[in-house]
From Swiss-Prot:
Residues 1-32, 88-113, 187-192, 240-245 are extracellular. It is found in: Membrane. Residues 605-614 have a biased composition (Basic and acidic residues). The modification Phosphothreonine is found at T305, T588. One of its GO terms (cellular component) is plasma membrane. The lineage of its organism: Eukaryota, Fungi, Dikarya, Ascomycota, Saccharomycotina. This is Uncharacterized transporter YHL008C. Residues 54-66, 135-165, 214-218, 267-627 are cytoplasmic. It comes from Saccharomyces cerevisiae (strain ATCC 204508 / S288c) (Baker's yeast). Keywords: Membrane, Phosphoprotein, Transmembrane, Transmembrane helix, Transport. It is a multi-pass membrane protein. The chain crosses the membrane at residues 33-53, 67-87, 114-134, 166-186, 193-213, 219-239, 246-266. Pfam families: Form_Nir_trans. Residues 512-537, 605-627 are annotated as: Disordered.
């Protein structure tokens, strides 16, 4: 199956799911919304046919409902086929793509949230648009039989409990994801339709619940006056079916593509040292599912030349025009005329290792007019290119120039482009270890001179340098003019918004009050360098307090105290004596603090009448004059 270009192996199909998820993650919101509305419009064709079959021949429904279920299964398969071929977005299929993508770490949870929410809302909008405009207003769904049939359909669906609808939704999307997965394995269009038809017929015939498939039928019935309110439809059908489809899609995605076809296969290949392949996406364009193929590593460079096969069909005249365009023939060829050049057999010209030598005469010597490197308008090659290049080597020269452009970050490795970045290599092959990359090891030794000497920290350094190398490659790609997909996709914007909101909420939290620092805390006599006043925590605390309104008010107002007219030192001494402070204590207070530092509010307190006794053999040594 590997050699057949029309089919893919399960491992290649699982990688195609990952590549498609990365492709859908870079869709802008307007494109994603339009794709989702289109998906609802296209898939509603199955719902319209469901109502038509059940309404216009009620006798068959009553006598042989199995035939009706088989027919409606084919109808929904047609709707899914339209969605896949047009590259539209369906909520149920996006569950498959982004679940595997998140498990593979190819996309983020923010990409998943945007895709699921927008596609879900877009499918609702598209289904409602078709049901109202082309169903109700056109009068098609207002026919008597359609009114009766549509009412019966939705009233039967909402008759189940929440849990019953939830369980039916789980089984339904398991089959839908299986249908999407099977069609990825085939390239012919008719085979795609056949493969996706079987699972769709299964879940329709059994009676499972598809949230998008039931939308148009439910809207038609409610517009026809069914005994179902909008709230009842949302609670009994829309919500349980959506949740069930999510669970069923997650289960299929985690078990089949991710675990069985990616983890198990790659783990076994590494254990047995099986031949290694490079996986490349040959359909990287938007609005279409990816197609991942495997090629051997030594074939990656030669693969780029396949796109230049049209150049190999050039005639000898076209080949000769490379050398004589806008110039005189005699200026380029000596010893041989241009006719002798044209007489060289084509088999000789198209050989890989051929030179312009033959048995017809002396070798042709190329003599350029000047050292100009003006490019030929035909092939874009310099005129001073040596003549011994064959057409195939010229093709390789041009294609390899394009091939040297690395596969962009955030995109699954593209066939025909250069080597992907480190992050994309790990997405392509989970067993790839950047630490084993020879080029990476050389750069690691350059960045860290102690890398080889300190074996104990070797692994930690490598893990750190892996991220450094990935960032370096991405910056180098952007510097060369590459488009940064990772910074411009909607999921990244959503992540930045949520992070910004979280930071604002955390910054609004009130800082718990702390006691003022003492002189000993600020300037410890035994270790001044370890003072908390000079630590980062103290600096950040002072900065935080200074940026708040309360902190600014405290900083400005702490130097001011309410007071009346200035008092003389005699008045202060009298108040000190009135509260019981003796003369020697008053003198000591004057020597230690000074009169200007006395606070009269402390002296006014009548509760502080504690008598200060005079220390013995201490104040006799003071010679300060009495006040």
């Amino acid at each position: 199956m590997v050699d057949d270009s029309n089919y893919l192996t399960p491992h290649e199909t699982a990688l195609a799911v990952v590549a498609t998820a990365m492709k859908k993650a870079r869709l802008q919101l307007d494109t994603l919304l339009i794709n989702s509305i289109l998906g609802g419009v296209l898939f509603s064709s199955g719902s319209f046919l469901l109502v038509a079959v059940y309404s216009e021949d009620p006798d068959i429904v009553a006598r042989n409902p199995g035939i009706v279920n088989l027919i409606t299964g084919v109808n929904f398969a047609m709707g899914l086929f339209y969605v896949v071929m047009m590259g539209a977005d369906l909520f149920n299929s996006n569950i498959l793509f982004f679940s595997v993508g998140v498990l593979r770490k190819a996309v983020t949870i923010y990409d998943l949230m945007i895709s699921w929410v927008v596609s879900w809302l877009g499918n609702i909008a598209g289904s409602l648009f078709v049901s109202y405009l082309f169903g109700h207003l056109s009068g098609i769904s207002s026919q008597k039989l359609w009114i009766i049939g549509s009412r019966q359909i939705i009233e039967q669906k909402v008759s189940y409990s929440f849990v019953q609808t939830f369980l039916k939704g789980i089984a339904c999307n398991f089959f839908v994801c299986l249908a999407i997965y099977l069609q990825l394995m085939a390239k012919p269009i008719h085979v795609k339709f056949i493969l996706m038809s079987f699972p769709i017929i299964d879940f329709i015939g059994i009676g499972f619940t598809h949230v998008v498939g039931d939308m148009s039928a439910s809207f038609i019935a409610m517009l026809n006056g069914a005994n179902v309110s909008v709230g009842k439809y949302i609670w009994k059908l829309l919500i349980p079916a959506s949740l069930g489809n999510i669970v069923g899609g997650l289960f299929f995605s985690a078990v089949v593509p991710f675990y069985l076809h990616l983890v198990v296969v790659e783990r076994d290949r590494k254990r047995l040292s099986l031949p290694e392949y490079e996986a490349r996406d040959e359909q990287p364009e938007l609005n279409m599912d990816s197609r991942v193929v495997r090629i051997q590593k030594n074939e990656c460079d030669d693969d780029a030349t396949e796109t230049g096969e049209d150049l190999e069909n050039l005639t000898e005249k076209g080949f000769a025009s490379i050398y004589n365009t806008n110039h005189d023939n005699s200026s380029y060829f000596t010893g041989r005329s241009l006719n002798s050049l044209r007489s060289i057999p084509s088999s000789v010209i198209t050989s890989d290792n051929v030179t312009m030598e033959s048995d017809l005469g002396e070798p042709v010597q190329f003599i350029p007019k000047s050292n100009s490197t003006t490019r030929s308008p035909h092939l874009g090659l310099p005129h001073n290119l040596p003549h011994n290049h064959s057409i195939k080597s010229i093709n390789r020269h041009r294609i390899n120039k394009r091939h040297s452009l690395r596969s962009p970050p955030g995109v699954f490795p593209v066939r025909g482009m250069g080597e992907p970045l480190e992050r994309e290599k790990t997405i392509e092959d989970a067993t790839y270890d950047p630490k084993e990359n020879e080029l990476f090891l050389r750069r690691a030794e350059t960045h860290n001179s102690a890398y080889v000497k300190n074996k104990k920290k070797e692994d930690d350094n490598l893990l750190r340098l892996v991220k450094t190398e990935e960032d370096r490659e991405q910056k180098e790609y952007e510097k060369n003019g590459g488009y940064n997909i990772l910074e411009n996709k909607p999921g990244t914007r959503l992540e930045k918004i949520i992070t910004h909101l979280a930071e604002n909420v955390s910054s609004r939290e009130v800082t718990p009050p702390i006691l003022p620092r003492t002189t000993q805390d600020t300037f410890p006599h035994n270790a001044p360098a370890s003072s908390p006043a000079y630590t980062d925590d103290a600096h950040s605390l002072r900065k935080a307090n200074s940026t708040t309104l309360g902190g600014l008010f405290r900083a400005v107002s702490k130097e001011f105290h309410s007071s009346k007219d200035a008092e003389s030192p005699d008045d202060l001494l009298k108040k000190m004596a009135a509260v019981g402070i003796n003369r020697n204590a008053r003198i000591t207070a004057n020597n230690v603090a000074g009169i200007v530092n006395l606070n009269k509010e402390d002296l006014d307190s009548t509760t502080r009448r504690q008598k200060i006794t005079e220390p013995k053999n201490f104040y006799n040594r003071h010679t300060s004059p009495q006040l």
